[in-house]
């Protein structure tokens, strides 16, 4: 769920080293009849559509520097293991056969994983409320030099509120829809996130996961967007480089507050959510400032909120972004391949997984969003038993993040992504900095 943009490839310990190109698993260059969302609109103006020019007809406003490395094959286990090591993965899955459907995969899941348990659902709420309250207590009592740790805990804890609202939106929290709407709205309020607008857009992410142009989460940067102007190019490079772990803020602003982005049947519910968010801001923020001042507002609300957006950006990037995971145009898109092959399971430190209610156990969630968060691990185990050879597995590590942030950038049919510094090396100082500054080891 971050703005439509790219990610990155990686594997540099110095400026002369180059990561092996991603294999051509199932990618596709856009045809002249496809429209795309402009990344700059996500950052500044809102969604507009622009006609994609075929790559061969693009104006050569930047000098491309191509590294003549033959793309490796991923047809056998040894090659996939090599790619996994290069990208920071534990496993890169085999291609799912074209004749396998999403229903085929779903039918192998135990029926119990779809069952809603009210006790477990409200236990999740208790965990989030308690951990968030503990975080606020730590912020209040911590000396200045321990505040970053308190903010990290509290930002992670409040991310749990988002996951609870996420379950409500997918009808996997309660059998009572009114309860889900109320809990979802309240859970999103500390994040000043409008529940219904997010729910409508997120449903489209699930319906069109990794579909070029149409997925409402992360997208590769369209080549013609990157070529359009030097100023825009620098903004894109910086936005998808150093500040990328907070770029979900741009997605939050762009997608959820403009009534024109919603269908007429959705507008009334969107207005209710917006009214709740604005009421929280109008009452909650002045109250915080009255009690602890503007610096207190920064200390108790803004910093944990930025911590939440770090996780929002990181989780959503890692879920669907890797050099070997393609985005496809609608006429080539396959639902089962997108949801199983195109989703990543990533293990994080246990305390993060607990506070965030296993949002990282993401493959079963894309097989069926109706699986409650507390049943995701059982569903994942079933998927590993029946479809494990097709899954992408990782443990959160520096190499994985370095790959995403320094390589998965501009859309390309053959390679899936082309890094910024291969297209505009003289303007890619932020990417060069990340390659030098980010450690290159995998846990």
Curated annotation (Swiss-Prot):
Membrane topology, as annotated: Peripheral membrane protein
Motif (Histidine box-3): 362-366
One Pfam family it belongs to: FA_desaturase
Pathway(s) per entry: Lipid metabolism; polyunsaturated fatty acid biosynthesis
GO molecular function, one term: acyl-lipid (n+3)-(Z)-desaturase (ferredoxin) activity
EC number(s) stated in the UniProt entry for this protein: 1.14.19.23
Compartments (UniProt record): Plastid, Chloroplast membrane
Keyword check for Ligase: no
Motif (Histidine box-2): 202-206
Main location class: plastid
Residue ranges annotated as motif Histidine box-1: 166-170
Transit peptide residues according to the UniProt entry: 1-64
GO cellular component labels: chloroplast membrane
Reactions performed catalytically: a (9Z)-octadecenoyl-containing glycerolipid + 2 reduced [2Fe-2S]-[ferredoxin] + O2 + 2 H(+) = a (9Z,12Z)-octadecadienoyl-containing glycerolipid + 2 oxidized [2Fe-2S]-[ferredoxin] + 2 H2O
Keyword field: Chloroplast, Fatty acid biosynthesis, Fatty acid metabolism, Lipid biosynthesis, Lipid metabolism, Membrane, Oxidoreductase, Plastid, Transit peptide
Function: Chloroplast omega-6 fatty acid desaturase introduces the second double bond in the biosynthesis of 16:3 and 18:3 fatty acids, important constituents of plant membranes. It is thought to use ferredoxin as an electron donor and to act on fatty acids esterified to galactolipids, sulfolipids and phosphatidylglycerol.
Comment text on domains: The histidine box domains may contain the active site and/or be involved in metal ion binding.
Protein name according to UniProt: Omega-6 fatty acid desaturase, chloroplastic
């Amino acid at each position: 769920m971050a703005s439509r943009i790219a990610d990155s490839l990686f594997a540099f310990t110095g400026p002369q080293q180059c990561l092996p190109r991603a294999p051509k698993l199932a990618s596709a260059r856009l045809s002249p009849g496809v429209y795309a969302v402009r990344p700059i609109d996500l950052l500044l103006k809102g969604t507009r559509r622009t006609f994609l020019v075929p790559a061969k007809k693009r104006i050569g406003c930047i000098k491309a520097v191509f590294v003549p490395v033959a793309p490796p094959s991923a047809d056998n286990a040894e090659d996939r293991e090599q790619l996994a090591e290069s990208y920071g993965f534990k496993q890169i899955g085999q291609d799912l056969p074209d004749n396998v459907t999403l229903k085929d995969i779903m039918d192998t899941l135990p029926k119990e994983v779809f069952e809603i348990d009210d006790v477990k659902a409200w236990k999740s709420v208790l965990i989030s409320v308690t951990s968030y309250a503990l975080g606020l207590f730590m912020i209040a009592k911590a000396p200045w030099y321990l505040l970053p740790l308190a903010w990290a805990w509290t930002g992670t804890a409040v991310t749990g509120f988002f996951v609870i609202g996420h379950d409500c939106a997918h009808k996997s929290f309660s059998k009572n829809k009114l309860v889900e709407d109320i809990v979802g709205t309240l859970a999103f309020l500390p994040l000043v996130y409008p529940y219904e607008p997010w729910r409508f857009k997120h449903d489209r992410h699930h319906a069109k996961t990794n579909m070029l142009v149409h997925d409402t989460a992360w997208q590769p940067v369209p080549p013609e967007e990157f070529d359009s102007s030097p100023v825009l190019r620098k903004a894109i490079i910086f936005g998808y480089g150093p500040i990328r772990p907070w770029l979900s803020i741009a997605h939050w602003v762009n997608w959820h507050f403009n009534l024109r982005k919603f269908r007429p049947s959705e507008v009334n519910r969107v207005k209710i959510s917006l009214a709740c968010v604005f009421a929280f801001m109008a009452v909650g923020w002045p109250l915080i400032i009255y009690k602890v001042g503007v610096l207190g507002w920064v200390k108790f609300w803004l910093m944990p909120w930025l911590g939440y957006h770090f996780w929002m950006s990181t989780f959503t990037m890692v879920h669907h972004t890797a050099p070997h995971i393609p985005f496809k145009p609608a006429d080539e898109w396959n639902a089962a391949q997108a949801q199983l092959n195109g989703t990543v399971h990533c293990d994080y430190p246990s305390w993060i997984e607990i506070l965030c209610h296993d949002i990282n156990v993401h493959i079963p969630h894309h097989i069926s969003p109706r699986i409650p968060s507390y049943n995701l691990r059982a569903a994942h185990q079933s998927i590993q038993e029946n479809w494990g050879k097709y899954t992408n597995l990782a443990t959160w590590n520096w190499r994985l993040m370095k790959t995403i942030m320094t390589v998965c950038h501009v859309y390309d049919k053959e390679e899936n992504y082309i890094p910024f510094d291969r297209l505009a090396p003289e303007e890619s100082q932020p990417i060069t900095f990340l390659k030098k500054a980010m450690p290159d080891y995998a846990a």
